[in-house]
Amino acid sequence: MNENLFASFITPTILGISILPLIMIFPCLLFSAPNRWMPNRLVALQLWLVRMVTKQMMSMHNKQGRMWTLMLITLIMFIASTNLLGLLPYTFTPTTQLSMNMGMAVPLWLGTVLMGFRNKPKSSLAHFLPQGTPTPLIPMLIIIETISLFIQPVALAVRLTANITAGHLLIHLIGSATLALSSISLTVSTITFTILFLLTILEIAVALIQAYVFTLLVSLYLHDNT
C-alpha cells in the first residue's frame, strides 16, 4: 500500500470525534498564568516577547490602533505556538488547514476594514480610485482595487498554509528517505539525516517568521484604516 503524503494533514479524530479544538487549546496551557510573586524564566520570556512585539508593530499606530495590542500579541503567540507544535512527533499542525487560517484572516481583515469605513470613510473610499485617474479607466480601476481588497485575507491564509505545509512535506519526504536508506547505506543515511536536522532547524525559523509576517500584515492593514 502506498503511503499518502498528506495523511499527516488530515484532521485527527478519536472515535469519530475531532480533537482539533483540544490541540488548539494546548498552547494556551503551556503559557499558564504564574502563581508566584517572583517571575520565573518563562514569564520573563513572555514579557520580553510582549515588549518586542509592541515595539516592532505598535509604534506606528495611533491611539485607536493601539487598542489592538493585546489581540495582535495573542495572535502572534498563538500562531507561533501552533506552528512549533506541529514539529513535534505524532502531532497535528492546525495552521496547515486553510479553513482555520481563513477563519483567522477574514475576521481580522474585516475588522480593520470596518474600522476604516467608520472612522475615516472618505479616505477609505479614496483607495478605490487613485487621484488623477483618467476618466475612461475609472470603472476598471475601481474593480481592480475592489478585487485587491478582497484578496488580502485570502493571501494571508494561503501564505501561511503553503509555507507550513511545504516544510512539513519536505521533512516527511526526507525522513522517509532516511529511514529507507538506513538499511541500504549507512553513509547516505547519515547525510540525509544531517539534511533532515538542518531542515528541522530551518522549519523552526519558518514557523516563527510566518507567525510574525501574518501578524505584521494584519498590523499594516490596521494602520491603513486607523
UniProtKB/Swiss-Prot annotation:
Keyword Cell membrane on entry: no
From the UniProt record, give one GO term of the biological process aspect. Answer: proton motive force-driven ATP synthesis
Q: Which Pfam families match?
A: ATP-synt_A (PF00119)
Indicate the principal place this protein occupies in or around the cell: mitochondrion
- Transmembrane ranges, per UniProt, are 14-34, 68-88, 97-117, 138-158, 164-184, 193-213
Provide this UniProt record's keywords sorted from A to Z.
ATP synthesis, CF(0), Hydrogen ion transport, Ion transport, Membrane, Mitochondrion, Mitochondrion inner membrane, Transmembrane, Transmembrane helix, Transport
Topology term for the membrane: Multi-pass membrane protein
Q: Name one GO cellular component term.
A: mitochondrial inner membrane
Provide the reaction this enzyme catalyses: H(+)(in) = H(+)(out)
Q: Where in the cell is it found?
A: Mitochondrion inner membrane
One GO molecular function term?
proton-transporting ATP synthase activity, rotational mechanism
Give the superkingdom in one word.
Answer: Eukaryota
Q: What does this protein do?
A: Subunit a, of the mitochondrial membrane ATP synthase complex (F(1)F(0) ATP synthase or Complex V) that produces ATP from ADP in the presence of a proton gradient across the membrane which is generated by electron transport complexes of the respiratory chain. ATP synthase complex consist of a soluble F(1) head domain - the catalytic core - and a membrane F(1) domain - the membrane proton channel. These two domains are linked by a central stalk rotating inside the F(1) region and a stationary peripheral stalk.
Q: Which family does it belong to?
A: Belongs to the ATPase A chain family.
Q: What does the record note on quaternary structure? A: Component of the ATP synthase complex composed at least of ATP5F1A/subunit alpha, ATP5F1B/subunit beta, ATP5MC1/subunit c (homooctomer), MT-ATP6/subunit a, MT-ATP8/subunit 8, ATP5ME/subunit e, ATP5MF/subunit f, ATP5MG/subunit g, ATP5MK/subunit k, ATP5MJ/subunit j, ATP5F1C/subunit gamma, ATP5F1D/subunit delta, ATP5F1E/subunit epsilon, ATP5PF/subunit F6, ATP5PB/subunit b, ATP5PD/subunit d, ATP5PO/subunit OSCP.
Q: Which NCBIfam families match?
A: ATP_synt_6_or_A
Name of this chain's protein: ATP synthase F(0) complex subunit a
